[in-house]
UniProtKB/Swiss-Prot annotation:
Belongs to the AIM41 family. GO terms for molecular function: carbon-nitrogen ligase activity, with glutamine as amido-N-donor. The gene is AIM41. It comes from Zygosaccharomyces rouxii (strain ATCC 2623 / CBS 732 / NBRC 1130 / NCYC 568 / NRRL Y-229). Residues 1-18 form a transit peptide. Keywords: Mitochondrion, Transit peptide. This is Altered inheritance of mitochondria protein 41, mitochondrial. PANTHER family: ALTERED INHERITANCE OF MITOCHONDRIA PROTEIN 41, MITOCHONDRIAL (PTHR28055:SF1). The keyword Transit peptide applies. It is found in: Mitochondrion. One of its GO terms (cellular component) is mitochondrion.
Amino acid sequence: MFRRAAFIKPRLTGFIRFNSTESYNAALGGLKKDLKQAMLAKDELKKTTIRGLLSTIKNKEIDNKDKTLDEFTLFDLYSKLISQRKDSITEFLANKREDLVAKEQHEMGIIEQYRSALPVASKEEIDSKVLQLLKNLKEKEPTLQMKQAFGKIDWKTVNSEWKASPNAVKASIVQQFKNVF
């Protein structure tokens, strides 16, 4: 006659990032804190830029839900967004849209600020390590091709030993290879 009420177990409502590093979580926490500060200060440009960053990061998390996300992923993502802003600036300059150029430059400055705050090696440090590696390879094998140079690097340890993203190292190898060989 009377039915017993089913107990509903509470579920976790928040999203827990099991596959991410501590510095990745700290960077996201800093972005959210800065978003709150921008909202309180009514800084529309900074607010929309940070929201765009958080949206892009969330999309990356969805795309790579089974992979570990780290500061190097954020570095690559920020670098991609900065290059998009640079392309937009050249387009706006060609079309004489100075107002949009100023907006894109300001957004690019905000993104560069967050990129420089990440605990990764600078471009100069990466270039010096790549240059030294390529010089050592040239002494051993003077007729080395670029494809073979990529094979000589242990890509699994680039993040931990070089403190750099593999994409940044690859770009540096392409740039430095022409100078050395």
